[in-house]
Amino acid sequence: MGDTEFKCRKCGKVVSFEQYISDRFCPYCGTFLSPRCQLKYWVFQFNPAIYRWFDRIEENKETEQWLTSQYAKDIHEGDKVAIWASGEKAGVYAIGEIITNPRKSLLATEQEKYWTNKEDIYKFREKYSVTIKYLKIIIDRPLLEYQCNKDPALADMAVLKQPQGTNFPLTKKHWNRILELIDKNK
């Protein structure tokens, strides 16, 4: 638990587990830190044959709406996300931050044209989604699946073991290693 972090819902500052245990209040603004404020890390996966993310990201590199098909109750504003493409060139292609809590909402109109099967758009009416703000896009130097499989710190990631799905939890150890390897790929 010592590497757990909490994000204050009011001021947005990140608080260490030690600070959380000692006081339960944000040292920056005084807001009570509930256990739900625990910062989490995720992989959000897309299938390029179903959603043309690479085309989409060329048009808008700022924000994007994503389904939270699994873990909607665990995903929160402020959590960090690695964007993973499935398929032949599977791997991490972007890093982002969730900027909304999960909610039921129609798919943003500008995203509709990137779905190869327009019937898939209905999922946004029935399931929860979040908006992600992209912090780093690494299309030209992704962290590929084979690199993750070879790395002892990443080889047990859920997206590698059971790759069917949209959302996968990451540990802080996974997250830090992903960032480290992305920086080495520069």
Residue ranges with predicted function:
Residues E5, D23:
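Residues immediately within or flanking Cys/His clusters that coordinate Zn2+
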Residues C8-C11, C26-C29:
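Short cysteine-rich clusters marking metal-coordination/redox-active sites
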Residues K10-E18:
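Short Cys/His-rich zinc-binding micro-motifs
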Residues F17, R24, T31, R36-E77, ...:
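Compositionally biased, charged N-terminal/linker segments
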Residues K89-I95:
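Short, Lys/Arg- and Gly-enriched loop/turn segments at beta-strand edges
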Residues E97-F168:
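Aromatic- and Lys/Arg-enriched surface recognition patch
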